[in-house]
Structures are given as C-alpha cells and as structure tokens.
Amino acid sequence: MMASMGRRRRRLAAPGAKALELIAAERREHPTRAERALAAILNEVNGGALEGRFRREWVCGGRWIVDFYFPEVRLAIEVDGGYHRSTFQLGWDLFKAAELESAGLTLLRLTNQEVLGDRARLHGKLRHAWWTALESGRRSRSAPGQ
C-alpha cells in the first residue's frame, strides 16, 4: 500500500497537463468542506443569479487548476483555506491570478469563511463576479481588431 501511494504521488507530481488532469480528478473526488458548500450554493443559484454550467477543478491552459469555472463567461472561482495565507502561497496566488487574468479570465477569490459564512453576502459577491465577467467578455469581443 505505501509503495503504491509513493508511486501515485510521484505520478501526480510529474510536470505537464496530464499530471494536472490527475490532480484535478483527485480534487473533484475529495473536495474541501468549503468547496462542497460552494458547489451546492452554485447549483442552488445557477439559472437565477448566475447562469450557465460550471466545472469543478478545471485545468486552465495545461498549467493551472481552478476550483470552479464558468466557461460561458470565463469566470474562475478559487476557494482559499488557511494554507493560502502563507507568504509563499500568497505570492504564488498573485502570480496565478495575473496569468489567469492575462488569459482573459475573471477571477474571484473567496476564503473558506466567506463561503461558509453569510449566504446573502456570498450570493452578492458571486453575482457581481459573474456580471463583471460577462461584461468583460462583451468588451473584449467588441474591441477593435478582435
């Protein structure tokens, strides 16, 4: 058992998009409490405050995994637990955000507390991010030379 776990970890840690797909699949099978809660909330408000299908643990450009993604409006949502408060992870998250936004995605970062806390406030943040992404997509499609 331990030997197979070691091989599995090495395989998942291998560079490349295939490794990211494996990691994303594992994360879909074992979401955090906040990710489970947000998935339920997104299903609840989908078609109302938010429209369109979303994907969980989506691999973006073969380089990044985002917790939730609405492809129709290019909205990525990340749920950040305590680990994201470390100095290293804060820097990495800023780098990831810059790359995602430069690729034309709108990124909404939520803490576990925001997801598990005040539901009305969360709905407002989700609606605002969704409309921001929708408007951003409209602007980029109507830009000269596009």
Segments predicted by a language model, with ranges:
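Solvent-exposed, charged helical/coil patches
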Residues: 1-53, 134-146
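A short beta-strand motif that forms part of the nucleic acid-binding face
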Residues: 80-83, 114
